[in-house]
Amino acid sequence: MRHYEIIFLVHPDQSEQVGGMVERYTKLIEEDGGKIHRLEDWGRRQLAYAINNVHKAHYVMLNVECSGKALAELEDNFRYNDAVIRNLIIRRDEAVTEQSEMLKAEENRSERRERRDRPDNTDGSNENDSDSDNNADE
């Protein structure tokens, strides 16, 4: 069995069906003896360019280990499902299980937002302290 990274984009009007689609696709892979190494739901995001007058899509990424038969069946499911507006399947040399750069960046962004929105400064530093230290030497 080979390793693959699969990304598919779902029409934004069908976002509520994403959970069922992912469940169906993972079941298809696992019934054939494959494994899901990583599953990430990136949510609705702006597209770089419009696809059939659609400007947003729901992104899902899977890292799987599966047979060629299961992959062909998955590709057929993507092709005949009108809700899937784009898909990309890349062969990988090994299983990838760590978090993707997309999710890492999103977590960093949310952490920065939380720190910025916090009313008190909990790290113990005071922005004005460095200025007063510099002025004390003069």
From Swiss-Prot:
Q: Which GO terms describe its cellular component?
A: cytosolic small ribosomal subunit
Annotated spans, Disordered: 97-138
> Which key words tag this protein in UniProt?
Ribonucleoprotein, Ribosomal protein, RNA-binding, rRNA-binding
Bias class Acidic residues marks the residues at 126-138
Q: Which organism is it from?
A: Stutzerimonas stutzeri (strain A1501) (Pseudomonas stutzeri)
Q: Where is the composition biased (Basic and acidic residues)?
A: 97-121
Instruction: Briefly state the protein's biological role.
Output: Binds together with bS18 to 16S ribosomal RNA.
Gene3D superfamilies noted in UniProt: 3.30.70.60
Please provide, alphabetically and separated by semicolons, the GO molecular function terms listed in this UniProt record: small ribosomal subunit rRNA binding; structural constituent of ribosome
Protein's name according to its UniProt entry? Small ribosomal subunit protein bS6
